[in-house]
């Protein structure tokens, strides 16, 4: 039985309507001047009162026009919101279980199932729980109606019979009270009938036996998606509640661009704390890779090349040149190292090589006279511009201005000639004058011990923060010494420093 509201709502004057638009900060909420004649509720507009009146009359003027859908609504907004459920596209996704929804409010209601601190409403009579207060109130109204109470627990309206009250409760549940649904759609393989075509398609798995829905936790298969969902909630509830907390792996840009293998000798040094790294004199570290392998020609294509980089504290690290992009091979004419350069000598420089070998043979017989000659000899070590002719091929090995400016502070009385020979391998093989592809050098074991004994003191001076000269300056000086050996005009000057 529908109850008619006394008075016609269309007769309400337009001047009594609440002003539309957003309220300003200082304004108060609009007064609810439009009370309902059947209940105690009041509204601030005629439209809202009219929509509310449909809950008493059971009228639903806005009907869905989709095929096989008999739903109707009290407002145009609710009809438009419902029409989104007929769309095949689901735009709202749950971040916990990746379930998709047509409407945002459906997703919001679904998120309550993942909230560990969610507020649930539990019925004391049957123990059923509800996430929303409205659903809980509808459930309590059903209990009250079956017990004989003729008052609606949702809107507090009284009815004359239990049947009328139950029919009224459907309006609060969003269901139409007019007409009885018919099962219009029949299965082709059996006599069962269903309300919608979707129910028929879901029923078809009984006849086909297909099980397309696989459980990702136990590999059990199901023919219907709702059966899989029920299985997941029942058997794998803990796995569903776990949130994916694994961060995205951000790759190191250095390791992405170049794969640099570090030698085993550097691993104990790199594992030291930073305080010990700055205070400890690296007597052994300076000797790392001093005599790696016999120097090979950069023109040899069959062998793997190695490039030795100089770390900030004077440590050297070999880099496999095959791991670098091939375009980088053009940028390095000779490998960077604390030792002498691996130089491919052209044919026109072969006479110069004989002079270098004869000089090195004379160098083995004698030792530096004293450390007093170091300032004078350091000025003759090729720190002056080379006077070689451009036809000598020494242009590729000429000393740059930057290396000259760095090596100038090293011309101090505290500098010994033994420091200039830190590029000579201490424990290398004996000098072989017949070796063609290398510039190997050697000297007596006594000179090696004297050089090693003097290395720690000089290393501590170089590690001093007040000293502006780093170990890289020694490397550049070694390069200057090597480049000075390549010119025939500077060899006699360097030889006179030891006489």
From Swiss-Prot:
Sumoylated with SUMO1; which inhibits transcriptional activity, but does not affect nuclear localization. Blockers of sumoylation pathway such as SENP3 and inactive UBE2I increases transcriptional capacity. Sumoylation is increased in the presence of PIAS1. InterPro entries: Zinc_finger, Znf_C2H2_sf, Znf_C2H2_type. Keywords: Acetylation, Activator, DNA-binding, Isopeptide bond, Metal-binding, Nucleus, Proto-oncogene, Repeat, Transcription, Transcription regulation, Ubl conjugation, Zinc, Zinc-finger. Residues 1-33, 365-400 are annotated as: Disordered. GO terms for molecular function: DNA-binding transcription activator activity, RNA polymerase II-specific; RNA polymerase II cis-regulatory region sequence-specific DNA binding; zinc ion binding. Residues 41-242 are annotated as: Decreased nuclear import with localization in the nucleus but also in the cytoplasm. A motif (Nuclear localization signal) lies at residues 22-25. Residues 365-379 have a biased composition (Low complexity). A zinc finger (C2H2-type) spans 34-56, 62-86, 92-114, 121-143, 150-172, 185-207, 213-236. There is a cross-link at residues 244, 263 (Glycyl lysine isopeptide (Lys-Gly) (interchain with G-Cter in SUMO)). Residues 2-84 are annotated as: Interaction with KPNA2. Mice overexpressing Plag1 develop normally with high Plag1 transgene expression in salivary glands, spleen and weak mammary gland detection. They develop salivary gland tumors with major pathological features of human pleimorphic adenomas at the age of 1-5 months. Interacts with KPNA2, which escorts protein to the nucleus via interaction with nuclear localization signal. Interacts with E3 SUMO-protein ligase PIAS1, PIAS2 and PIAS4. Transcription factor whose activation results in up-regulation of target genes, such as IGFII, leading to uncontrolled cell proliferation: when overexpressed in cultured cells, higher proliferation rate and transformation are observed. Other target genes such as CRLF1, CRABP2, CRIP2, PIGF are strongly induced in cells with PLAG1 induction. Proto-oncogene whose ectopic expression can trigger the development of pleomorphic adenomas of the salivary gland and lipoblastomas. Cooperates with CBFB-MYH11. Belongs to the krueppel C2H2-type zinc-finger protein family. This is Zinc finger protein PLAG1.
